[in-house]
Amino acid sequence: MILAIDVGNTNTVMGIYKKDKLIQHWRISTDKNKTPDEYGILFLNLFNSANVNYKRIDGIILSSVVPPLVRILKKMTTRYFNLEPLVVGPGIRTGINLKMDNPREVGADQVVNAVAAYHKYGGPLIIVDFGTATTFCAVSERGEYLGGAIAPGIGISAEALYSYAAKLPRVEFKTPGQAIGKNTVAGMQSGIIYGFVGLVEALVKRFKDELKETPEVIATGGLVSLIASETDEIDKVDPFLTLDGLYYIAKINGIVE
């Protein structure tokens, strides 16, 4: 079995693959202050709760946009699983050609998403990831990573409202049903949800105009279903795109079950 670990700024997602199939997955809060032992105990408890034998893990792959956690999780996997993880970064084979001014600047999560989406759907593609940041990337018909856009995520945009506007309350992330809100909460929900729908539609249109092709639009991330249900610009929702990409990269680099 292969353990894939995707460390984001807000959440860390783990998945176990067996014979090309995702058989178990978890989402926890990312905490760079946890020690290797704390993460180790947490992982083992999750495995035990799902009746998964951690001793049957044959390989581990790790992607992180939080640099301090790479060292912590490497210590954890070495100590508790007796395995050195493959860390996604420069020098790792991905099968994707990064057509960027500085390929080293591309986030590991974006590379992993591009690998998964191209492997599963072919190209050309636009990939939208609703995470701490909302990221867009374009992949050519030949599997080249062409570049992208980075916008604030839904969560941090809403947090800015709460933090800088004293009278605005925290609101539940849900579709208000109409754009013209009849109260403060509905107005905020409209601005947050429909505002992000507009962001997605505008950037996807600009990407399509610049690509001069008809790409398929794939969306992933924690709040993807909320936005995808309000627009026709998203063709497919793939909640496990990043984990799948990690698994494909593990196989490309010789980590097999």
UniProtKB/Swiss-Prot annotation:
Cofactor: NH4(+); K(+)
InterPro entries registered for this protein in UniProt: ATPase_NBD, Type_III_PanK
Binding sites annotated in the UniProt record for substrate: 107-110, 184
Organism in which the protein naturally occurs: Halothermothrix orenii (strain H 168 / OCM 544 / DSM 9562)
The protein's annotated pathway: Cofactor biosynthesis; coenzyme A biosynthesis; CoA from (R)-pantothenate: step 1/5
Record-level GO cellular component terms: cytoplasm
Keyword Glycoprotein in annotation: no
Location(s), subcellular: Cytoplasm
Subunit note: Homodimer.
Key words, A-Z: ATP-binding, Coenzyme A biosynthesis, Cytoplasm, Kinase, Metal-binding, Nucleotide-binding, Potassium, Transferase
Main subcellular location of this protein, as a coarse class: cytoplasm
Active site: 109
Phylogenetic classification of the source organism: Bacteria, Bacillati, Bacillota, Clostridia, Halanaerobiales
EC code(s) of this entry: 2.7.1.33
GO molecular function: ATP binding; metal ion binding; pantothenate kinase activity
Positions bound to K(+): 129
Note describing how the cofactor binds: A monovalent cation. Ammonium or potassium.
Protein purpose: Catalyzes the phosphorylation of pantothenate (Pan), the first step in CoA biosynthesis.
Catalytic activity reported: (R)-pantothenate + ATP = (R)-4'-phosphopantothenate + ADP + H(+)
Gene3D superfamilies with a match to the protein in the record: 3.30.420.40
SUPFAM superfamilies given in the database record: Actin-like ATPase domain
Protein name per its UniProtKB record: Type III pantothenate kinase
Binding, ATP: 6-13, 132
Entry similarity comment: Belongs to the type III pantothenate kinase family.
BP GO terms, sorted: coenzyme A biosynthetic process
